[in-house]
Amino acid sequence: MKLSIIIIATSLVIAVVAFPSKDSKAIENDKTEQRMEIVVQETARACSKQIGDKRKRNCECCGKTVVCGTIYVGGKEVNQCMDKTSDNAILNGLGKGMNFIENTFSFCV
């Protein structure tokens, strides 16, 4: 008799521990959705700079093939919006295509 009570009690304890409640899963999913919304809201920005203007972020550069670039002037790093990627016309065309793809998949407005 005592053995059967111990077996039943052990089975109930295992069942309670093994199967978490449905409420805790819902709370966990809500937190994930909230984090995803915050990330999307923080990344979208509008452009305000033209080619050659100094910038801090890629989203500040306006244009479908314009991206932020880094050049060195007198050993000092300067970040600016640029369109041209090479002096070679073929490589420059490929570079503009890559810039277009990069801007297409960014969250910039």
Curated annotation (Swiss-Prot):
Residues 1-18 form the signal peptide. One of its GO terms (cellular component) is extracellular region. Expressed by the venom gland. Disulfide bonds join 47-62, 59-108, 61-81. It comes from the Eukaryota. It comes from Cyriopagopus hainanus. It is found in: Secreted. Its main location: secreted. Residues 19-46 form a propeptide. The keyword Transferase does not apply. Putative ion channel inhibitor. Keywords: Disulfide bond, Ion channel impairing toxin, Knottin, Secreted, Signal, Toxin. The presence of a 'disulfide through disulfide knot' structurally defines this protein as a knottin. This is Hainantoxin-XVIII-2. Belongs to the neurotoxin 25 family. F7 subfamily. GO terms for molecular function: ion channel regulator activity; toxin activity.
